[in-house]
Amino acid sequence: MKKIAIILFSFLFLTNIANSESRFGELTEIRDEKMRGKDDQWVRPHPGPFIWNHIESEKGKFFWEDVDQYVVYAQEHNQTILATIWPHTNWDQKSCKRKKAKSPFGKRFTKYLSKPCSMDDYKNFLTKLVDRYDGDGSNDMPGLTKPIKYWDVMN
């Protein structure tokens, strides 16, 4: 339960102070190689790879490859990740008949931008996500050397 509480704690105050000079890094689009951040700094990938719809596009089937690649890159550059979690997945939103919304991040983002319909499914996703990158030695990403300690929900 502590892990869930940590996730739900939001670092909204960082939004206004994050810039390239800040130790908290900057909001970056991870597809742009030069915007992945400098060595030895904080990075805040935005929207980043921590999108529920991308990781669990089908209920119960988790795709970690893109997130793992980002974490490995950050480890190689001694970066501290402040991960932004996006709590939307199409299959969950369809279950409660949410209306579609236009995403500011294009097609790689979900079609729906409402709160999760099933909090149990969302809790399961959050638990698996944090457990994979928490560095406690149980269910961790293979090769994890620098755990993610700071999480932001939707920024």
Where do the language-model regions lie?
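N-terminal substrate-binding region of glycoside hydrolase catalytic domains
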Residues: E21-N155
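Sec/Tat signal peptide C-region and signal peptidase I cleavage site
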Residues: N16-S20
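Sec-dependent N-terminal signal peptides
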Residues: I4-L14
